[in-house]
Amino acid sequence: MSRIGKRPITVPAKVQVTIDGTKVVVKGPKGELSRELPANVSVSQEGETLQVTRRDETRTSRQLHGLSRTLVANMVEGVSQGFQRRLEIQGVGYRAQVQGRNLVLNMGYSHQVQIEPPDGIQFVVENNTNVIVSGYDKEIVGNTAAKVRAVRPPEPYKGKGIRYAGEVVRRKAGKTGKGGKK
């Protein structure tokens, strides 16, 4: 039995779960998420908990069991609490700001980079160098944060660029010169 898959999912009081065959719909204060689960995995609700079970012991069923449980747990957590990713901007003259819903980045290019958030995603900028991407769908929050980071990933020589909060960038030594002009 999958160690992750057999753990029950607790459903908070303000979250409503609807199961229709292989489709799971989760509604909460932050929004509504739905997902079609694989046919060899089933979800059942007993009171305030959800249990994900697999129908047979084939290899693919065992692989999808833990994945499906984690996806449903992320849906429940997302509509009740939400998710966020923090990004840090390092570099002279690099800054971010929010205009309307869009994130505007000045990253040393000849132009500003505008990123329009998908539905359900918000950008918050703290003191021009910290960006918080928040929303209720963990996958979209992560993809949007990766899109922002891809504008100027951290470079290994000076460490300038956009990085996740807590990300450690491996630094490289620069070129060593021959020793002055002759």
UniProtKB/Swiss-Prot annotation:
Belongs to the universal ribosomal protein uL6 family. GO terms for biological process: cytoplasmic translation. Coiled coil: none annotated. GO terms for molecular function: rRNA binding; structural constituent of ribosome. It comes from the Bacteria. This is Large ribosomal subunit protein uL6. Keywords: Ribonucleoprotein, Ribosomal protein, RNA-binding, rRNA-binding. NCBIfam families: L6_bact (TIGR03654). InterPro entries: Ribosomal_uL6-like, Ribosomal_uL6-like_a/b-dom_sf, Ribosomal_uL6_a/b-dom, Ribosomal_uL6_bac-type, Ribosomal_uL6_CS. The gene is rplF. PROSITE patterns: RIBOSOMAL_L6_1. This protein binds to the 23S rRNA, and is important in its secondary structure. It is located near the subunit interface in the base of the L7/L12 stalk, and near the tRNA binding site of the peptidyltransferase center.
